[in-house]
C-alpha cells in the first residue's frame, strides 16, 4: 500500500528535476538552521558568479569557517496539519518529492561546480514517519557509499520514526536536528496537535545518548565509526504562541543542560497560512525579538549565564 501511495505521489507531480529543485528549495526557506545570503543577483552568462544558485545557504563550523550548503526538503508533501507550516496537508501549494538518486545527483553536481561544501536535508512527512526517515537514510547511504561524498551533511531526524532508522542515519550524518517547533507543550497542542513533546524529545534523547556512547567508544577504539560528530540542534518558532522571552530562555537552558545541544535556533513567526488559530502581528514578524533571543542565547552558551540572571540585570 505504501509503495502504491508513493508511486501515486511521483506520478501526480510529473515534474522535471529543476522544477522540483525550485519548489523544494523554496519550501525549505523557513528552516533557520543555516542562513541565506539575501543576495538576488543572477548570473547573466557574461560575468563570473551567480548569487541565485537555488537553495545555497551558509552555516558556520565550530572553528568559525563558513560552509556553503545545499538546503532542500526531500518532499513538501505532508500528512500533518500544523497551523504555522506552509507545507501542511491543507495548504494549496505546489507539491514535489525527490528520489534518493535525484538528491545524490544534485548534491554531487553542485559540489563539482563548487557551489556547495555540504547538504542540509529536511522533509515533510510522506506517507509515514518511518517511510520518510527510510528515504532520508537511503539518500545518505548512497551519498556516502556509492558517490563517496565526504562533505558535511546536516539531516533532520523525523519525530516518530523507528529509532533504528535514526541511528543508522546518525552514523552517516555530521549533524542531526529535531525541531522543537514551539516553546511549550501547550503551544504544540494548540497549533500542531498531530505532534507531541514525547515524539520530539525521545529521538533527541536517543541522539544525545548515542553521541555520549560513541565518544566513549572512540576513546577506546579511535577508528570506530562516528555518530553525529557535529552534535545536534533544534529550532523554535517565536511569536506564534504567547510565551515571553524568559520562558523561552528557560526552555533553551534546559535543552542545553539536559540534551547537550550544540545550538538552539529561533525563527520569528511569519503567518504564511492565514489560519484563524494564528495570531495577527501588526508589526509583522518579530525580527528584533528573534535577534535579542540570539544575543541572550549567546550568553547562555558561551558565558554560562542562567535564564534567571536576565531578570536581575539592571542598566
Where are these regions (language model features)?
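Core AdoMet radical
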Residues: 88-103, 110-136, 142-163, 170-219, ...
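Conserved C-terminal portion of the radical SAM core fold
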Residues: 184, 199-275, 285-308
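Flexible, acidic/Gly-rich N-terminal and inter-domain linker regions that tether
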Residues: 7, 11-77
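Short, acidic/polar
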Residues: 107, 162, 166, 245-252
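Short, surface-exposed basic-aromatic patches at helix termini and helix-loop junctions that form
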Residues: 168-173, 253-257
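Short glycine-enriched loops at secondary-structure junctions
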Residues: 72-76, 173-175, 182, 270
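Single conserved hydrophobic/aromatic residue that forms the stacking wall/gate
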Residues: 1-10, 312
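Local cysteine-cluster metal-coordination motifs and their immediate loop/turn environment
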Residues: 77-87
